[in-house]
Amino acid sequence: MSKAIKILLPLLLFSLSLQAERIKDIANIVGVRDNQLIGYGLVVGLNGTGDKTTSKFTMQSIANMLESVNVKIDADDIKSKNVAAVMVTAKLPPFSRQGDKVDVLVSSIGDAKSLEGGTLILTPLTGVDGRIYATSQGAISIGGKNERGGGVNHPLAGMLYGGAIIEREIPLDLYSKTGATLSLKSSNFQNAARVQESLNQNFGTQVAIAIDPRTIKLQRPESMSMVEFLARVEEVEIDYNRENKIVIDERTGTVVAGVGVKVGPVVVTHGEITIKITPEMSADNGAMDMGEGIKLSLNTNTLSTSGQTPTVSSVARALQRMGATPKDVISILEAIKRSGAISADLEIL
């Protein structure tokens, strides 16, 4: 016996959502970006929760560290459990100057039980070119406690807030430049054309030209510095054409969809579940309220919207309340998408 679920609503038209957005929120300036840094170090001062003595690379690292301070010892003779080998990562923001501080993430790579209470000893951080750009040292912050067990949430990774000092700058000269390039965060011909049009109208002259659906070349006016020009560019607003997207976390069943993602007329059967979206209206006064403007008729197993237009999120939540598993919800939404009743991209995590 199949279980019929009918979602009743008026017929609707689909369109991409338009909203005003600043250029700084939808585009990046090419070359102005973070750079990744990485290093290998040791965390000391652990209360017996460090790497085991069988971790040879840790014991060898301890021996090498001690030798750097004129203490010579064979790695095989080290029996300490208060030290852990870690990878240290950080992001070097654009225009960082010597002496600036950045946050650091420290992660265990051995068999340590916890980094809580430990101190990272001086660790150089290098870029992809192998050059040292920062150094890091300091006490590790693990974070909050687990409410259920009372222990640390994830004791094998921690932060050093402001724990790295910039030693080398990455040169980026804007002062002498006469041009720059904008890169839209998503490719779209309409958005690229709107950015070009809005900028040229705002400045009263041609300062922008779109060369593809993602890239806009800029030419600063002679009367402005590059910093002043880019600051003004970033504040210009356009009617941004935002494409609808549905994101589903398969592990948790979480469905995230924009408010404009609607469901059109369709009939989908998945196992014992049948979804029918039709333009007719239902008049069942005894229906159970499922939330999100959707009601369930106990007599006919029918979901109705009482004249409202359902969204993907409201349909998914109604299915979950009826006992559909995350896999069922994903399969149903995929089928609806293939039928053309959802004008949005579907992304499964």
UniProtKB/Swiss-Prot annotation:
Keywords: Bacterial flagellum, Periplasm, Signal. Pfam families: FlgI (PF02119). One of its GO terms (cellular component) is bacterial-type flagellum basal body, distal rod, P ring. It comes from the Bacteria. InterPro entries: Flag_FlgI (IPR001782). GO terms for biological process: bacterial-type flagellum-dependent cell motility. Transmembrane segments: none annotated. Its main location: periplasm. One of its GO terms (molecular function) is structural molecule activity. Residues 1-20 form the signal peptide. It is found in: Periplasm; Bacterial flagellum basal body. The basal body constitutes a major portion of the flagellar organelle and consists of four rings (L,P,S, and M) mounted on a central rod. PANTHER family: FLAGELLAR P-RING PERIPLASMIC PROTEIN FLGI, FLAGELLAR P-RING PROTEIN. Belongs to the FlgI family. Assembles around the rod to form the L-ring and probably protects the motor/basal body from shearing forces during rotation. This is Flagellar P-ring protein. It comes from Wolinella succinogenes (strain ATCC 29543 / DSM 1740 / CCUG 13145 / JCM 31913 / LMG 7466 / NCTC 11488 / FDC 602W).
